Amino acid sequence: MAGFSKVVATIFLMMLLVFATDMMAEAKICEALSGNFKGLCLSSRDCGNVCRREGFTDGSCIGFRLQCFCTKPCA
């Protein structure tokens, strides 16, 4: 009977671990139009460099109008 209790406890702990990791929330990403990028955004690498100088974590070219949008985790 002691062996059965260990199996049940192990299964319970494994299920708890699966549900706990599933419920963890990812950080939301906020984005804003770059204030310093000039012209058409044709290179997300250039956009990202400008955004990092503005204090963001990254940036990319988005949309039909090819604008540079900066991104960072929301506070």
Curated annotation (Swiss-Prot):
Matching PROSITE patterns: GAMMA_THIONIN
Pfam families referenced in this protein's UniProt entry, alphabetically: Gamma-thionin (PF00304)
Gene3D superfamilies referenced in this protein's UniProt entry, alphabetically: Knottin, scorpion toxin-like
Induction field: By wounding.
The protein's name: Defensin J1-1
GO BP term, example: defense response to fungus
Function: Plant defense peptide with antifungal activity against F.oxysporum and B.cinerea.
Lineage: Eukaryota, Viridiplantae, Streptophyta, Embryophyta, Tracheophyta
Subunit structure, interactors included: Monomer.
Locations listed in the record: Secreted
Organism, scientific name: Capsicum annuum (Capsicum pepper)
Similarity section: Belongs to the DEFL family.
GO CC terms: extracellular region
Record's keyword terms, sorted: Antimicrobial, Disulfide bond, Fungicide, Plant defense, Secreted, Signal
Main location: secreted
Disulfide bonds: C30-C74, C41-C61, C47-C68, C51-C70
N-terminal signal peptide: 1-27
InterPro entries attached to this UniProt entry: Defensin_plant, Scorpion_toxin-like, Scorpion_toxin-like_sf
Expressed in which tissues: Expressed in orange and red ripe fruit and to a lesser extent in mature, green fruit. Present in trace in young, green fruit.
